[in-house]
A protein has these predicted regions:
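Acidic, metal-coordinating catalytic segment for phosphate/diphosphate chemistry
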Residues: 1-16, 22
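A generic structural micro-feature
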Residues: 7-11, 82-88, 104-107
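Short connector loops at helix/strand junctions that flank enzyme active sites
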Residues: 12, 20, 38, 65, ...
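Conserved Nudix-box catalytic region and its N-terminal flanking loop in Nudix hydrolases
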Residues: 21-59
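A short coil-to-beta-strand element that immediately follows conserved catalytic motifs
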Residues: 64-73
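Active-site-adjacent beta-strand/loop module that shapes the phosphate/pyrophosphate-binding cleft
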Residues: 75-100
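NUDIX/MutT-family hydrolases
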Residues: 91-93, 102-135
């Protein structure tokens, strides 16, 4: 590849949470999108991944979550709206409590997907599917 093919705005560092309740995984999606992803968001300078995950859930869903064990790192490169993107996802266990998880943002929505249906639900990147499917037996909230 040429240097121009690697031009990116930067590699994004993102904290993501795996929250399983009743055999279902909490996911987030842009409204109208056929794909979904684990909830979370960008880590700001000076934050830990756990702090960023808790902050993002407060901002996006208005809830306080408990972050748990570190589950892994997922690299992801993709095209979006004609632009190259690259991200490093730090994935943590997350407990969102017993209440409903509703977006405070007008462009995203939260939902629950059965652990056996992560592929059909369009969970991306695909590496999240293995982490999510493994989650049910290991740390259901």
């Amino acid at each position: 590849m040429t240097a121009g093919e690697y031009e990116l705005a930067g590699i994004e560092t993102i904290a993501r949470g795996i929250c399983v309740r009743g055999g279902r995984l909490l996911v987030c999606r842009a409204k109208g999108s056929a794909t979904c992803y684990l909830p979370g968001g960008h880590i700001e300078f000076g934050e830990t991944g756990r702090e960023a995950l808790a902050r993002e859930m407060r901002e996006e869903a208005g809830i306080d979550v408990r972050t748990g064990a570190f589950r892994g790192v997922v690299e992801n490169s993709f095209m979006q709206h004609g632009a190259k993107h690259a991200e490093i996802n730090l994935v943590y266990e997350m407990d969102a409590g017993e209440g409903e998880v509703v977006s405070k943002e007008d462009w995203i929505e939260f939902g629950w997907v059965g652990l056996g249906e992560l592929g059909e639900a369009g969970l991306l990147p695909e590496a999240f599917r293995a982490l999510g499917a493994d989650a049910g037996a290991r740390f259901e909230a």
